[in-house]
Amino acid sequence: MAQHEITRCQAMILQYMQKVITTYEHNYAIGRRLDMSPSAVRGAIIRLIKLKLITEKDDEGQRLLEITKLGKKHMIILDEIKKSRWT
């Protein structure tokens, strides 16, 4: 399986999605919860969708974000990511 390095923003969103599983929240609400800008949230979500870690569906006119099976298995520890980037 190919390995991809993900950013801190993507890791934070993936950790959040592992806790809530599904959400109808907009980028602004997720950003406020995680202390990120809405544009950073959107960019991270797009990348996570490309990596097939989360999915985005249209549910009666609202965006539904769901974590995939691969996303559930993907364990991310922010401390390890920080260490690997700065060592």
Question: Could you say what each language-model-derived stretch is?
Answer:
Residues 73-87:
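Amphipathic alpha-helical dimerization/coiled-coil segments
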Residues 52:
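Glycine-centered, phosphate/nucleic-acid-interacting loop/turn motifs that mediate DNA/RNA or nucleotide
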Residues 22-33:
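Short acidic, hydrophobic short linear motifs in intrinsically disordered regions
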Residues 39:
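Key DNA-contact positions within bacterial/archaeal DNA-binding proteins
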Residues 45-46:
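Short, hydrophobic-biased segments on the C-terminal half of alpha helices
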Residues 58-65:
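Short, Lys/Arg-rich nucleic-acid/phosphate-binding segment
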Residues 1-13:
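Short alpha-helical segments that sit at the start of domains
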Residues 15-22, 79:
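Short, locally clustered residues in the helix-turn-helix/winged-helix DNA-binding domain
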